[in-house]
Amino acid sequence: AEARVPTFTHTREIVESNPDTPIDGAEELRRAAGETGAHMHQCHVHSTSRRHIERVLQTLALARAEGSKVTVEAYPYGAGSTGIGAAFLAPEKLDAWQITPSNIMLLPSGEVIADTTRLKEIRETAPGTACIVTYLDEFDPNDKATLIQSLAYEDSIVASDAMPIFWLDGSNETREWPLPAGGSTHPRTAG
């Protein structure tokens, strides 16, 4: 609060996904904002809340009504990227996320995980493999409404995953300038 800058907060699990969590992630953010006076900015509000976004946003709205400065960010799509070894992608935890192994695609190969056996194999042999996890189906009207709700929340901003670029030819991301052929960026950030 003294620095007058927001915290960029990655919340813990919500109670709907993990009833054993010591405190619901959205409630913890609400309390921290109220107790410290800090501007709390919740990262990836829709991917951490998934189909429980309405309840989470109501909790954050309560914080705002209590005088706290709370903002959020969301991706404009129903997927996120991480490493296949992430704790929440353990086969026994997928139900809490309302996903199955087929919601996970490996990068850069494009392989969609066929089943739990394959998921366990990749997690054991190559836990750092990047993947895309689809948790909201943008073609499903209910999931699309959930996504839009998170983007339309007051003081919400559009975010991205900040993952490395995976080129189709297998080459690695570089800081080379100008951008390599096939790369693109927004004109405001082009230099």
What are these regions (language model features)?
Residues 30-34, 39-191:
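Active-site neighborhoods of metal-dependent hydrolases
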